[in-house]
A protein has these predicted regions:
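Nucleic-acid endonuclease domains
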Residues: 2-90, 96-97, 106-248
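Redox-cofactor binding/interface segments in oxidoreductases and associated redox assembly factors
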Residues: 103
Length: 248
């Protein structure tokens, strides 16, 4: 028997594409249970009342239901026996009775991805240099400008309001449901965030390791001078999600 000693070429997967490597890198935002300080039953009751006068409108127009920011922040403050602290440029909206900081967001899920939530916007210091860095294709420097500003903003909020753990609490609307999901914010992990390059038309910069790419996407936008979070549809299948309301 003649043996073929020619070995098959081994396919090497680049390290940055290997899921086992990516998954071990701690993210700045990670899914977690709704904090125990928040009374979920209270939130459900408030959403039910809110929707009573609106449900028929959403059914007839085919639009997704939407929770207005002013209501959601007020509800979370009441449900946590806390208070609203987010007026102005504060990095959090609510301080719970357990001294947790909650940044509340309300988004609509459309075609697999939500509309945006602004994490950081700057038209002055960092914003002035952003156009130049985009023109020079310096994505790392541009992203660093905004992540450093974000760290400063959050840590200042945490210190001034004596906050412990920090969270982003999201109301997510689909055609039929309103959900609530929580992301824990680990601000000290922001150094893990990397640029994954510009989009084709150089309008924004994609990021890695800010959030698991299966559940969300965070980009820096040139025109808006803003770091934005969008959630992906996969997030509504997470075990920590709470269904607040269903349109019958």
């Amino acid at each position: 028997m003649i043996r073929n000693n020619k070995s098959k070429d081994k396919i090497v997967i680049p390290e940055k594409l290997r899921s086992d490597v990516i998954d071990t890198i701690p993210k700045v935002l990670e899914l977690c249970p709704i904090p125990e300080s928040i009374d979920i039953t209270y939130i459900k009751d408030q959403v039910k009342v809110y929707m009573e006068g609106r449900q028929q409108f959403y059914i007839e127009t085919g639009r997704n239901p939407y929770i207005e920011d002013e209501f959601s922040e007020y509800w979370i403050a009441k449900a946590s026996k806390g208070k609203q602290i987010g007026k102005g440029s504060c990095g959090m909206d609510v301080k719970t009775h357990k001294n947790e900081g909650i940044d509340v967001m309300c988004v609509v899920m459309n075609k697999g991805i939500s509309n945006e939530k602004s994490l950081m916007q700057n038209f002055s210091s960092a914003g002035k240099n952003l156009d130049t860095l985009f023109t020079e294709k310096k994505d790392i420097e541009a992203l660093t400008l905004f992540t450093e500003e974000y760290i400063s903003k959050i840590k200042k909020t945490q210190l001034n309001n004596n906050l412990s753990d920090l969270y982003i609490l999201s109301f997510i609307s689909t055609k039929k449901n309103i959900y609530m999901i929580c992301l824990k914010l680990y601000i000290d992990r922001i150094n893990n965030v990397k640029s994954s390059g510009f989009t084709e038309k150089l309008k924004n910069i994609k990021t890695e390791y800010f959030i698991d790419s299966k559940i969300g996407d965070i980009r820096l936008y040139k025109s808006k001078k803003r770091l934005e979070l969008r959630l992906k549809n996969n997030i509504i299948y997470d075990t920590n999600i709470v269904n607040l309301y269903t349109i019958e």
